[in-house]
Amino acid sequence: MKLSRRSFMKANAVAAAAAAAGLSVPGVARAVVGQQEAIKWDKAPCRFCGTGCGVLVGTQQGRVVACQGDPDAPVNRGLNCIKGYFLPKIMYGKDRLTQPLLRMKNGKYDKEGEFTLITWDQAFDVMEEKFKTALKEKGPESIGMFGSGQWTIWEGYAASKLFKAGFRSNNIDPNARHCMASAVVGFMRTFGMDEPMGCYDDIEQADAFVLWGANMAEMHPILWSRITNRRLSNQNVTVAVLSTYQHRSFELADNGIIFTPQSDLVILNYIANYIIQNNAINQDFFSKHVNLRKGATDIGYGLRPTHPLEKAAKNPGSDASEPMSFEDYKAFVAEYTLEKTAEMTGVPKDQLEQLAQLYADPNKKVISYWTMGFNQHTRGVWANNLVYNLHLLTGKISQPGCGPFSLTGQPSACGTAREVGTFAHRLPADMVVTNEKHRDICEKKWNIPSGTIPAKIGLHAVAQDRALKDGKLNVYWTMCTNNMQAGPNINEERMPGWRDPRNFIIVSDPYPTVSALAADLILPTAMWVEKEGAYGNAERRTQFWRQQVQAPGEAKSDLWQLVQFSRRFKTEEVWPEDLLAKKPELRGKTLYEVLYATPEVSKFPVSELAEDQLNDESRELGFYLQKGLFEEYAWFGRGHGHDLAPFDDYHKARGLRWPVVNGKETQWRYSEGNDPYVKAGEGYKFYGKPDGKAVIFALPFEPAAEAPDEEYDLWLSTGRVLEHWHTGSMTRRVPELHRAFPEAVLFIHPLDAKARDLRRGDKVKVVSRRGEVISIVETRGRNRPPQGLVYMPFFDAAQLVNKLTLDATDPLSKETDFKKCAVKLEKV
């Protein structure tokens, strides 16, 4: 669109006047720009992190041409972060995939062949053959899927149905296993229900913010802007930031704490001890609403059973616990004295006391925020449990301005991975595959034979890598994720399985990522507003958007791929005879007919869409697929504390926070007057537990799986930077973001660099026991590691830092610890 200088100035003047009058800028744009087709604006949640910012998307002539913060969005109130402003450009990279690609030689599939353009029918032909062969020869455990916290809600639901009900395989897991699994298990252990009890409105009412392993200034910048506003507007507000290295969030900190890796467990127990020793327990809350339990210890590190660390563990993978008295709990935390804590953590005593006083002060409303520093941790579940302890001891929970809050990193890690239940052990609404009653509920709702869903937990993310390497998992489909770059221990545990000739790997992606280029078949995927979608953010807010443009070429949404592929299988090909005998009416039907084109899902006509409304999947099928899938899925949570609103309500609103009961969303769960599931007179009720009480756990410090030694003498921590998101497969295709941070660097303390004869800008080889990468020395800038630790982001495909990382996981959540392994440096 071209504008004369006069028109441009006129547009700016009108926009400024409109802003002053409180009018929306898109309306002004339509009024001013008359030379060509006007830009059409519609709402959508941002494509990036779990904050869930609302944006206005401008489309013209079939392309997304503009994006701005939505002033009516309650999350961001019209403000975007730097990534959000460049959303249109993520869709139009020069190497966007538009047609399926198969490795071929001499006209047919070959594992060592070159990628060759094929049709969708050809792609599904080879997929069908590979899936059916694996199912026939080795059974459902030989196939698997790795999905995403970036799936829309109905994409995740469709995938879970296809694998768990259709193929009878629980080998489906999301990449949220790498980021949110510890939070999930922590919530379930303490409260019996997943996801935070508070919301973002807490920010404007809190007196203190404590960040545990969360660089919100770069990873959740819009929320950080709200915290900054609260801190700078009120001199009595305090910010404490804890990390293993100094980062941009420290710029606002009143108490910036650098601790030795893994010793956050010590600090958490010290604060609990401080609260007890200073008689700061909220006795009324504690006596009515809390139970105490002692957890199993020495639980291993989630490595292969043959690993020496696993052999040495007394209780590998144990989630066991037993009741304990308050006196026993008091004695347990009493060992974590101020002196011992300062010694183990390297944190000055006065800083530790200042931190503990925030929680102990009955007049201070405290919010605890955390992300990957807690979750990507070999004791991540414990860390989650221990921070809940502090809020439960003091009663600072489920009320405006105070509570524990786990922040998510992906746009629908909550709404899709967690709530839908795309983990290998989960079903919708916090149900699990190991519970016969839960399986029965799903099987009846889905009208499939009893016993269809396997009771055995499937392979989690890291276990999938190991099974591929071992030749046990032979057909593997990944969607909306770049795990060859993002997952741990690439050299030893991932690449061997992907390139094993016994295995067939399918990657659905918009771009030729590291994962796509390591696959055998690449399926081009529609992204963001090229499809109708729904995400669920960190504060339980479910948000919808409409399809606003069509995908380029033959790119198709993940939902289309799943549903169309299901047509290739009849029930007799995937279910044993004893199951078919229970529902003989399903014989001869395709999985498409059994799972998707059912009376329950297909009852909403496509005529519910406006005539000019894009919806490629529904118009092709002849019914409103997204609405049918959502309403079927939402049934599982309604009446059980996971209530979602009717489908149409979300297109009208800027998101709603569940539980949504009688048209009203819930800001604070578990407290009387805020949560519709808490009756008058109950005060608080943690209704995920049978007795309505939350659990305080006694859990000790246990060391990291791998620490520096004489040879590998530095800690390595990995993470992100503001300008790029995860592996950079979208943001590195935005020229402005790429120029702002073009390549990964190794952040290192100047004295550590000097001791190794390294200077800023030097090339350096970073070496672990598993691999090596070459990076660039950075002794200045935004991240300032202490001596003994280096930090490296993972967005750069040319510097695969996960060649270095260890595939140790939290044994309870199976989430990888990307924050702690040992490396050495060699000058290049």
UniProtKB/Swiss-Prot annotation:
[4Fe-4S] cluster binds at residues 46, 49, 53, 81. Residues 39-95 form the 4Fe-4S Mo/W bis-MGD-type domain. Pfam families: Molybdop_Fe4S4, Molybdopterin, Molydop_binding. It is an enzyme of class 1 (oxidoreductase). Residues 1-31 form the signal peptide. Keywords: 4Fe-4S, Electron transport, Iron, Iron-sulfur, Metal-binding, Molybdenum, Nitrate assimilation, Oxidoreductase, Periplasm, Signal, Transport. Predicted to be exported by the Tat system. The position of the signal peptide cleavage has not been experimentally proven. InterPro entries: Asp_de-COase-like_dom_sf, CT_Nitrate-R-NapA-like, MoPterin_dinucl-bd_dom, Mopterin_OxRdtase, Mopterin_OxRdtase_4Fe-4S_dom, MopterinOxRdtase_cofactor_BS, Periplasm_NO3_reductase_lsu, Prok_molybdopt-oxidoreductase. SUPFAM superfamilies: ADC-like (SSF50692), Formate dehydrogenase/DMSO reductase, domains 1-3 (SSF53706). GO terms for cellular component: membrane; nitrate reductase complex; periplasmic space. GO terms for molecular function: 4 iron, 4 sulfur cluster binding; electron transfer activity; iron ion binding; molybdenum ion binding; molybdopterin cofactor binding; nitrate reductase (cytochrome) activity. Coiled coil: none annotated. Component of the periplasmic nitrate reductase NapAB complex composed of NapA and NapB. Belongs to the prokaryotic molybdopterin-containing oxidoreductase family. NasA/NapA/NarB subfamily. This is Periplasmic nitrate reductase. It comes from Shigella boydii serotype 18 (strain CDC 3083-94 / BS512). The lineage of its organism: Bacteria, Pseudomonadati, Pseudomonadota, Gammaproteobacteria, Enterobacterales.
